[in-house]
Each structure stands twice: as C-alpha cells, then as structure tokens.
Amino acid sequence: MAECFAGGTATFLIMGNICTRDCLYCNVEHGKPVSIDEKEIHHLIGAVQKMKLEYVVVTSVTRDDLPDGGAQVFSQCVSKLRKALPACKIEVLIPDFQGNQAALEKVIAAKPYAINHNMEVVKPIFAQLRPQGNYDISLELLKNIGSSPVISKSGFMVGFGESREDILQLIDNLASVSCSRLTIGQYQQPTLKHWPVAKYYHPDEFAEFKEIAYQKGFQHVEAGPLVRSSYHAAKAIQGSRVK
C-alpha cells in the first residue's frame, strides 16, 4: 500500500460493497446491493484531489441488478474525474457487464486511460469458481477492449489447483485478443469457508510465466506472489518492462 501511495496511485471501490455474485475465492459480501449514491462521484473527486494522486484505478463490485451493470456510473466517474483533474490518468477495473456490448461501449466512449477486466482463474475451473460468470464472455469483452483505442489489461491468480498447461493456455487466450497488460498473482484463501489453496508458487515460477507472457507479445507484465491487478498500474500503462 505504501508503495502505491508513494507512486501517487490509489484504487477506489464504487457502487457499494455488496456484490451480486458469490465467487468461491472472494471475500466481498454477497447479497442485495445498496442503491447508487449520487454524491459518490463528488466524494471520489474530493479524495483524489486531497491525496494529490497522479494515477487512479476505479473499480466496483459486480452489479447484475443494474440494467447496464453500472457502466454509466463508470463512464460518469471517468468524465468528471478528467474534468476536475486533467493531468490524472484513470484506469477502470470493470466487471463483465454480462456480455452487454452497449454497456462496454459507454465505458470506452468515456476514454479512460486503460480498461482492466480480470479473468481471475483458468478455463477448466472457471465455471466452478465463478458460477455466475462465463470464461468466453470475459474473453470476448477483452477482445472488444483490445480492438478499441483504449489500453486493454487483465489479470489472474494461481494456486487453485490448475496445471501449468492451463496457465499457459490462459496467457495464450489473452494474447490472442490483443490484451497488452497482464498481472499474475498468488491466490490466498480469505477464510476457511473459501476455496483452499492447492499450491503456493515459487517466485521462479512467476518469473517464468512473466517471461513467457512477454514472449507472447504483452507490453507489460507483473507476476509474483503478492501481485494484484493494480500493482505498478502506472508503470504498466507506460508500457515499461519492469524486471
């Protein structure tokens, strides 16, 4: 956290803290979400100004209860943040919008610096761990982002019981849809009620996956036990290769 703040970067959660989905690895509360707070955007702008941030990541819980999945809220956040802080770069980390292309277009039209959508897990166990999600829908979403002028980014965790071949297949799939930024991190079991950790990967294994991803054409890759989707976000968007 200190490393992020030192770099003028922070991540903000919008649209409440209750998710409409119940993934087996996630500790976010599941249930009926709260209504959208119309003042939230103003609070967000105020926080970014007070913290003097140079790079902001805006994310949300999944809001399947909203017609557009919250795309309009993301769009407004990007537009109003840019108007208030023209020099601040804005990345959005979005849900899948249930494959709603019109919803995604709202976010793309707002012209964030980058759009991130995390695949989270490999294909063979995706349906089991993310029963309300869909691997192909998420990949198609990233394909549509990759074909837009906005930078495309994704990430996933390892340690669920996947094979090396599963990991390489996911890297290949992401490369095939023009995803240019990638994060790979170690899954940590939030509570005993969640999916157990099957394996803790060695840093050398993460280094190998990182190099493979670069060979596949990714412009920036972060891979390591403590890496999460917003880690080194600003450096990643610059396209610098950090070893």
PLM-predicted stretches and their roles:
Residues 1-29, 45-57:
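N-terminal pre-triad scaffold of radical SAM enzymes
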Residues 34-42, 54, 70:
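Fe-S ferredoxin-like electron-transfer domains
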Residues 92, 108-110, 114:
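Phosphate/pyrophosphate-binding betaalpha-module
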Residues 13-14, 24-38, 91-100, 157-164, ...:
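Active-site mouth loops of central-metabolism enzymes
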Residues 31-33, 63-72, 126-135, 194-203:
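Glycine-rich tight-turn/loop motif centered on a GG-T
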Residues 1-8, 42, 46-52, 76-87, ...:
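Auxiliary Fe-S-binding modules of radical SAM enzymes
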Residues 57-67, 97-99, 113-132, 151-153, ...:
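Conserved radical SAM core fold
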Residues 56-58, 90, 115-117, 182, ...:
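Hydrophobic residues within beta-strands of alpha/beta enzymes
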